Amino acid sequence: GYLDIADFILQNCTNVEDNLQELYRRVAFNICIGNTDDHFRNHGFLLTAKGWTLSPAYDMNPTLNEYQSLLINSSTNKSDLNGLLNSSEEYMLQKHIAQQIIGEVLVAVKDWKIVATLLSITKRGAFRYYI
């Protein structure tokens, strides 16, 4: 699951703290938008001059299932922000940092309908992604 990616970060990446926070942010985002097709091929790493780092996020689309493809912690893949928050230590994050990240993600996705309108996405197209 996601903790396998976290383990890779711990063992191989530079800026471990930043990469772990970014991974956690992506898990929270996937839960918030209903992207449950979040298998290992949707996560990558880039080798930079300073070392390995998470690649930019890609293939993050709502699929609206109740469970993630990957475990969000050591025991469940249920799409649940409380479960993610309660597992913050498994991502080597202090709880207040995890709360901040989840809060930022919630703020970022809350106005998706307004953004869809500004980008001229049809109501029919936007409704497909209603969350």
Question: What do the predicted segments below correspond to?
Answer:
Residues 1-131:
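Anionic ligand-binding catalytic core segments
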